[in-house]
């Protein structure tokens, strides 16, 4: 808890007793500090308030992105009023000095301030007309004051009533529950023209610039703008600038979903308002003094170009890029071209010539920022044009090359990057020449201290190393030694972005240098004292070995590599998993060549399994699991048994992360060993695992269930049936887990256990679970019953669960139907043998008063009909059709979805002709709701059987033709 700062002389005591000189900070500064300290003391926030603050968009953005809150609309009376009131609130009020006569005794307040606040908030949320609100924030007072005002609606004029209605709709969209939000959004969309653009945008746009807005609220407000734009059409033209002020900053948001939403709004706006209006609005911002405004304007213009066509914008871009009035306009024009290249991707090829004519002259511009952004734009266009378009870039190669030889610093970096991006587009002979020349510059700039230059060198090096004329010999003699000397240093390891680029470049160079040479150069970093440097080296070794293998490593280099990796593993103190994953990648690649090194590695693992630090024990167990297949390939079965015994003795581990890794290692050993020779034996391991199933840690649960399932699959006879039943009851508890992977593993394990000890005992435990109230547990139990039926045969399960259906309890009957649904989905066309067997049960379910019964029975019919189509059971399906078709008038969304699925499946089993006989009469029924239900089914049939339905359309009798009634009969 922070406390207010206590200042010397803050209590205004008598100064006549001060012996020293009265030298201090200025009075106004001291008063400001005192006010700030008092504010901190009064407004201390608890943890929940701090978390709520971090959810706001403003608090998650950096200083650059926060600048969008400073953007202003065109000045009008409303904004001036708000600004003046804000300035009044923020003005420094002179502090009034108190005398001792002003001090009064304590007087109890008439009302509790907390109670007053709570009552006022609840009154706001429950006020008439806005009862569906979920919350009402303090910042909402500013934008929705007319909604919560006490003024009677009869005293309002027509426009004020309309404004209050609009505010209420916006408030429900922003703060309301889901149903209220959808209704309000639909009403606002339908009445957008009635409200008019002025009223809507003056209310809506300021909310989007509110600093306390959260992601969800911002998303809803932006969605509202998007919907309204379609309705208003041309009426939005006067408000294009205001909308862009809100929408353009979304294009630089960190969240890709927000960026795509911003693009969608600007696309719709440009379509509605037209090119002329958009460009007229953007024109002043092209040469704005603020770099932030120019940046978002360039991105918005690129979106407009994508929406309306790049060719439409080319004259405007060309004029901006060749502007003589302002270099900032040229800078923004070039940036528009860059953003077009990013947005269109390979589609920029069609417009490459026109865009190049706009920017080619800017490489020789007098202003450095213009030259830099031009080079970056050329680089972007070249990367997005790969592997085509070098003919267009020929015009800029000469000025680029001259610039590389004459420039230094950031300009050189950008020019070098542009040439490096064009090299992959060139023919091999030209690419070889430019690469050789570029390599001289790269070698010279290896010593550059500038991080931007370093990244550019690395990117160009990646592209140049792929050129055919650059030989492995040239790289080894001229580039690689200096590259490893300059870039493989500790300082680079601490810079994460540069670290990643260096690692990737090393792997790219390794394709030509070879695995042996690269590994040899990385051995020194692997043994370094600095852990980040070792971790960086392991990353590079892992990716190199995965890419190239270890076939060209000699015996000496293998020994040194394993030794270095073992040192890195032993010295590890952080939680990065790459160390043992890298170790695993090398061992898997070496395979049987690892045999001489297994003894010291396993010895290290055993020592680490007894280490006092949990993280060390966890890494040892993880490495052990990775090494198991290699140890097995080396036929070191005694070593596996020794490891298994040590791991078994460690099952009393108290740290769940470590215990999960130990169980996973034991699982790996059991999966590769001969179970007759496994030590300790399965009948000793399984009873130890059963109580561990109660551990609620996710990693422990997943690995334990997986291990038990493996034992049930490979060695069911090694444990007595009673032990398996104990495990069944433990697994039933795991079906309640919130983790999907755990529930899926538990269900699969039920199948293995049922196969091991027979379905009857397992079914007893599962059927008891159908009687519980918890829906998720009943659903998982139904899935488990379906799996048992698939493993042990439906003939073992169906009689039992059909008998269970006679229980007069809704939950049990629903569970049985759901189990049948999963079962028939799993067993496929085996279902055909049981159609007549379960028809009476489905008949009962489809005529039940409970909607969920009918819904689940429809699901059963869906799987039956799809799996048994064409098997000659049409009579049973017609019977089920007669029972299902009356349900098409249901209004519940979940139920009608399942019922329609069932009808579509029956149409597959019966054919469109027979099925459509049930539909024709309903299509022209006098009641609208009846027609609506049947037309919905007909539309689905029309999509599925458009051509097959033609012979079955009703034939009207014609006096001129002979009409044969028998052809309409279904035999």
Swiss-Prot record:
For this protein, the parts annotated as crossing the membrane are: none
GO BP of this protein: mRNA splicing, via spliceosome; spliceosomal complex assembly; U2-type prespliceosome assembly
For this chain, one GO molecular function annotation is:
mRNA binding
| Compartment(s) where it occurs, according to its Swiss-Prot or TrEMBL record | Nucleus
Q: What is its main location?
A: nucleus
One GO term describing the cellular component: spliceosomal complex
One family from Pfam that matches here is PPP2R1A-like_HEAT
Q: Which family does it belong to?
A: Belongs to the SF3B1 family.
| Quaternary assembly | Belongs to the CWC complex (or CEF1-associated complex), a spliceosome sub-complex reminiscent of a late-stage spliceosome composed of the U2, U5 and U6 snRNAs and at least BUD13, BUD31, BRR2, CDC40, CEF1, CLF1, CUS1, CWC2, CWC15, CWC21, CWC22, CWC23, CWC24, CWC25, CWC27, ECM2, HSH155, IST3, ISY1, LEA1, MSL1, NTC20, PRP8, PRP9, PRP11, PRP19, PRP21, PRP22, PRP45, PRP46, SLU7, SMB1, SMD1, SMD2, SMD3, SMX2, SMX3, SNT309, SNU114, SPP2, SYF1, SYF2, RSE1 and YJU2. Interacts with RDS3.
Other remarks?
A: Present with 521 molecules/cell in log phase SD medium.
Name of this chain's protein: U2 snRNP component HSH155
**Naturally occurring in which organism (per UniProt):** Saccharomyces cerevisiae (strain ATCC 204508 / S288c) (Baker's yeast)
Query: Which classification does the entry list for the species?
Result: Eukaryota, Fungi, Dikarya, Ascomycota, Saccharomycotina
Instruction: List the gene name.
Output: HSH155
């Amino acid at each position: 808890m922070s406390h207010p700062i206590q200042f010397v002389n803050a209590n205004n005591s008598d100064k006549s007793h001060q012996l020293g000189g009265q030298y201090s900070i200025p009075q106004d500064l001291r008063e400001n500090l005192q006010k700030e300290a008092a504010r901190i003391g009064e407004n201390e926030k608890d943890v929940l308030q701090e978390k709520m603050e971090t959810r706001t968009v403003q608090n998650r953005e950096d200083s650059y992105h926060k600048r969008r809150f400073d953007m202003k609309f065109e000045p009008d009376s409303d904004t001036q009023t708000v600004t003046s009131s804000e300035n009044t609130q923020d003005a420094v009020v002179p502090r009034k000095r108190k005398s001792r006569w002003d001090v009064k005794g304590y007087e109890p307040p008439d009302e509790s301030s907390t109670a007053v606040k709570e009552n006022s908030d609840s009154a706001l949320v429950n006020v008439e007309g806005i009862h569906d609100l979920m919350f009402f924030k303090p910042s909402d007072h500013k934008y929705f004051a007319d909604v919560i005002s006490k003024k009677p609606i009869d005293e309002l004029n027509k426009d004020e009533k309309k404004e209050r209605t609009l505010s209420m709709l916006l408030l429900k969209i922003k703060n309301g529950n889901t149903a209220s939000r959808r209704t309000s959004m639909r009403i606002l969309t339908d009445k957008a023209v009635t409200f008019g653009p002025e009223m809507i945008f003056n209310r809506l746009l300021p909310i989007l610039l509110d600093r306390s807005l959260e992601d969800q609220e911002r998303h809803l407000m932006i969605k509202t703008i998007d919907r309204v734009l379609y309705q208003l059409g041309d009426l939005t033209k006067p408000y294009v600038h205001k909308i862009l002020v809100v929408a353009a900053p979304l294009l630089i948001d960190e969240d890709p979903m927000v960026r795509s939403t911003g693009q969608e709004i600007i696309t719709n706006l440009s379509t509605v308002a037209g090119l002329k209006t958009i460009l007229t609005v953007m024109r002043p911002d092209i040469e704005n003094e603020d770099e932030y405004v120019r940046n978002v304007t360039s991105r918005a213009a690129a979106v407009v170009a994508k929406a309306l066509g790049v060719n439409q914008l080319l004259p405007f871009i060309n004029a901006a890029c060749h502007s003589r009035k302002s270099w900032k306009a040229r800078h923004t024009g070039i940036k528009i071209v860059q953003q077009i290249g990013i947005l269109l991707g390979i589609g920029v090829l069609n417009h490459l010539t026109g865009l190049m004519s706009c920017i080619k002259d800017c490489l020789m511009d007098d202003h450095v920022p213009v030259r830099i952004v031009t080079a970056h734009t050329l680089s972007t266009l070249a990367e997005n044009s790969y592997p085509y378009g070098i003919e267009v870039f020929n015009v800029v190669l000469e000025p680029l090359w001259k610039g590389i030889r004459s420039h230094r610093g950031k300009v050189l970096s950008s020019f070098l990057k542009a040439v490096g991006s064009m090299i992959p587009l060139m023919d091999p002979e030209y690419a070889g020449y430019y690469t050789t020349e570029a390599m001289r510059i790269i070698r010279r700039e290896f010593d550059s201290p500038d991080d931007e230059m370093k990244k550019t060198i690395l990117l160009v090096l990646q592209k140049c190393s792929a050129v055919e004329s650059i030989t492995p010999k040239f790289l080894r003699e001229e580039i690689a030694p200096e590259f490893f000397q300059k870039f493989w240093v500790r300082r680079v390891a601490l810079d994460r972005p540069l670290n990643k680029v260096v690692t990737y470049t090393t792997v790219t160079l390794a394709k030509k240098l070879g695995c042996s040479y690269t590994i040899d150069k990385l051995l020194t970093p692997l043994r370094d004292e600095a852990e980040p440097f070792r971790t960086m080296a392991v990353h590079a070794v892992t990716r190199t070995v995965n890419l190239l293998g270890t076939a060209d490593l000699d015996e000496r280099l293998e020994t040194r590599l394993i030794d270095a990796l073992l040192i890195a593993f032993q010295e590890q103190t952080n939680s990065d998993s790459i160390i043992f994953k890298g170790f695993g990648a090398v061992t898997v690649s070496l395979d049987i060549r690892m045999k001489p090194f297994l003894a010291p590695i396993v010895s290290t693992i055993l020592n680490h399994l007894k280490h006092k630090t949990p993280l060390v024990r966890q890494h040892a167990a993880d490495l052990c699991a990775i090494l198991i297949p290699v140890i097995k390939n080396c036929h070191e079965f005694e070593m596996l048994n020794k490891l298994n015994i040590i791991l078994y003795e460690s099952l009393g581990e108290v740290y769940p992360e470590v215990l999960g890794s130990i169980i996973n290692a034991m699982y790996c050993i059991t999966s590769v060993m001969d179970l007759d020779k496994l030590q300790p034996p399965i009948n000793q391991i399984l009873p130890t695992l059963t109580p561990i199933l109660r551990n609620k840690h996710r990693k422990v649960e997943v690995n334990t269930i997986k291990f038990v399932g493996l034992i049930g699959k490979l060695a069911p006879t090694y444990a007595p049936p009673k032990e398996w039943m104990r495990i069944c009851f433990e697994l039933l508890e795991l079906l309640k887990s919130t983790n999907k992977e755990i529930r899926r593993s538990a269900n699969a394990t039920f199948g293995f256990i049922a196969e091991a000890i027979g379905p009857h005992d397992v079914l007893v435990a599962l059927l008891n679970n159908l009687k519980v109230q918890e829906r998720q547990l009943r659903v998982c139990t139904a899935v488990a019953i379906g799996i048992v039926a698939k493993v042990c045969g439906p003939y073992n399960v169906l009689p039992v669960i059909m008998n269970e259906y006679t229980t007069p309890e809704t939950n049990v009957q629903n569970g049985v139907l759901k189990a049948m649904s999963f079962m028939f989905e799993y067993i496929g066309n085996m279902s055909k043998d049981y159609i007549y067997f379960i028809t009476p049960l489905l008949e009962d379910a489809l005529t039940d008063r409970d909607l969920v019964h009918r819904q689940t029975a429809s699901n059963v019919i869906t799987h039956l009909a799809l799996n048994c189509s064409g098997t000659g059971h049409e009579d049973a399906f017609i019977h089920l059709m007669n029972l299902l078709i009356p349900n098409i008038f249901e209004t519940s969304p979940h139920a009608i979805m399942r019922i329609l699925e069932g009808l579509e499946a029956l149409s597959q089993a019966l054919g469109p002709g027979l099925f459509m006989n049930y539909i024709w009469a309903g299509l022209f029924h006098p009641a609208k709701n009846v027609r609506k239900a049947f037309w919905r089914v007909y539309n689905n049939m029309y999509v599925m059987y458009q051509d097959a339905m033609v012979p079955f359309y009703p034939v009207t009798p014609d006096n001129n033709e002979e009409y044969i009634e028998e052809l309409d009969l279904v035999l």
